[in-house]
């Protein structure tokens, strides 16, 4: 809801470590694949290290995800919209923002065009007083267990970090 700026957002399903096989080349494992109430498919990727071309990674994952969700014979307008949210520890664009929206623009006239693909880059490095930066602080600050602005997120963090039940739940997800 915070990153996509949609208070009414509903996650209909959530699949961690979603494997996409590619018979023609490199396969990939998406960190998280979600289907939203409005039909959009979201891939959330989390990256700590800055050691690769992450924009190409986003493009590749989106292409495989789109190919994976398209049914044979589907018209292109029937393919669900795809959103990739790339969350990093570092400010990839080094412009001092916690959230970047990358849009498709016609260079010649500045018109924004929509092909059903959205990419958002979030980082935990920048504290710009936005809600996104405050949310990222919950994930990175060691003592963020009872935050008033994000009570559900901070309580889930407490569960995973400080209880046996949470550790067991995480182990099941990883397995």
Where are these regions (language model features)?
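Low-complexity, glycine/alanine/valine/leucine- and proline-rich hydrophobic stretches
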Residues: 106-115, 123-125, 135, 139-143
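Active-site/binding-pocket entry motifs
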Residues: 127-128, 163
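Short hinge/gating elements
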Residues: 122-124, 170-171
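Short, charged alpha-helical interaction segments and adjacent helix-coil junctions
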Residues: 35, 42-47, 133-175
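Accessory alpha/beta interaction modules
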Residues: 1-118, 128-130
């Amino acid at each position: 809801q915070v990153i996509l700026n949609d208070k009414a957002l509903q996650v209909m399903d959530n699949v961690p470590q979603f494997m996409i096989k590619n018979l023609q080349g490199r396969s990939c494992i998406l960190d998280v694949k979600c289907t939203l109430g409005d039909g959009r498919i979201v891939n959330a990727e989390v990256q700590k290290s800055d050691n690769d071309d992450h924009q190409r990674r986003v493009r590749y994952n989106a292409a495989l995800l789109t190919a994976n969700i398209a049914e044979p014979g589907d018209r292109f307008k029937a393919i669900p919209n795809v959103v990739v949210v790339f969350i990093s520890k570092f400010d990839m664009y080094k412009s001092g923002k916690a959230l970047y929206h990358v849009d498709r623009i016609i260079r010649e006239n500045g018109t924004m065009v929509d092909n059903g693909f959205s990419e958002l880059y979030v980082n935990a490095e920048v504290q710009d007083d936005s809600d996104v930066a405050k949310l990222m602080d919950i994930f990175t600050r060691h003592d963020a267990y009872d935050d008033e602005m994000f009570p559900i997120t901070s309580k889930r963090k407490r569960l995973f970090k400080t209880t046996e039940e949470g550790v067991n739940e995480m182990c099941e997800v990883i397995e």
